[in-house]
Amino acid sequence: MTQSLTITRPDDWHLHLRDGDMLRAVLPETARHFGRAIIMPNLVPPVVTGAEASAYRDRILAALPEGMTFEPLMTLYLTEDTDPADVAAAHASGLVKAVKLYPAGATTNSSSGVRDFDKVRPVLEKMAEIGLPLCTHGEVTDHDIDIFDREAVFIDRVLDPIRQSTPGLRVVMEHITTKDAADYVRSQDKDLGATITTHHLIINRNHILVGGIKPHYYCLPVAKREEHRLALRQAATSGDARFFLGTDSAPHTDANKLQTCGCAGCFTATNTMALLAHVFEEEGALDKLEGFASKNGPAFYRLPENDGQITLVKQDAPVAFPEQIDTPDGPVTVFDPSFAVHWTVT
């Protein structure tokens, strides 16, 4: 029996589009289903000023295929040299919707990130004053901290002190991967939200390591124990408006994934909405999918919801998604959930 679900056109509140040929190849995969996306600024070199964000936005719009509608929501990469006045001007112009905090060395192209948080305090204070959200890659990078503990330690050592010392600062904990993070969000009464990725609702660390290394499941923050995956599912499907979709879809060519020091990231733009329908159906929460994917994010960012709609249809036969996206730089493998998916977007 065919089953369908029509929802407000969703948004992606954490997306990597890269630049150049890669941008042109992967942008349609997002624009096909999503109305808007928060665009990550970790290019080489990173997007650190309003002028650079404006130029990057122009390149994204120029790469958008004719007939597609999509609005890139730009961010700035926070560095120890970021100018509070430039941040305020970029926000006032309507260009920049958030500033991204990368602890130095935490993930792809994060070497320009923050090491001394006292040096960015004036920027954070200005952001609190003007209501501009801070998006955080929530991991410490200390060599003595186990990679599976980086998120929990970040909350204690970095995030909570920042929030305590900067009242009114609106924060998005991006791509949370632990029960600790979900519980922290719930424990706060205002000014805090969190994005959850599609792949962290599906995989745990066993998917990466059991039966041989699976490079296409390797991402940062790395997937955790099963108890954490289940906690993320509960948060995403709960209807709590503080949790919303941020895919962290991150295209890397197979050549860069399948090597002795492979890149971190899962490319989920192609099949995210179908996978989410599968997950929410498993949890008996299809009625909560629209909130998670289409309503909670705009509410946090104080933006209107999208005007359009998409329809998800469940078919009797499994849906065959592309295994790869061809790019001039080489193929990019589409995330494979390792189970049959019967949902598709029509």
Swiss-Prot record:
It is an enzyme of class 3 (hydrolase). It catalyses: (S)-dihydroorotate + H2O = N-carbamoyl-L-aspartate + H(+). Pfam families: Amidohydro_1. Keywords: Hydrolase, Metal-binding, Pyrimidine biosynthesis, Zinc. One of its GO terms (cellular component) is cytosol. CDD domains: DHOase. Its cofactor is Zn(2+). Pathway: Pyrimidine metabolism; UMP biosynthesis via de novo pathway; (S)-dihydroorotate from bicarbonate: step 3/3. Binds 2 Zn(2+) ions per subunit. Zn(2+) 2 binds at residues 100, 137, 175. Its EC number is 3.5.2.3. GO terms for biological process: 'de novo' pyrimidine nucleobase biosynthetic process; 'de novo' UMP biosynthetic process. GO terms for molecular function: dihydroorotase activity; zinc ion binding. The active site is at 248. It comes from the Bacteria. Disulfide bonds: none annotated. Zn(2+) 1 binds at residues 14, 16, 100, 248. Substrate binds at residues 16-18, 42, 137, 220, 252, 264. The modification N6-carboxylysine is found at residue 100. Catalyzes the reversible cyclization of carbamoyl aspartate to dihydroorotate. Homodimer. Belongs to the metallo-dependent hydrolases superfamily. DHOase family. Class II DHOase subfamily. PANTHER family: DIHYDROOROTASE (PTHR43137:SF1). This is Dihydroorotase. The lineage of its organism: Bacteria, Pseudomonadati, Pseudomonadota, Alphaproteobacteria, Rhodobacterales.
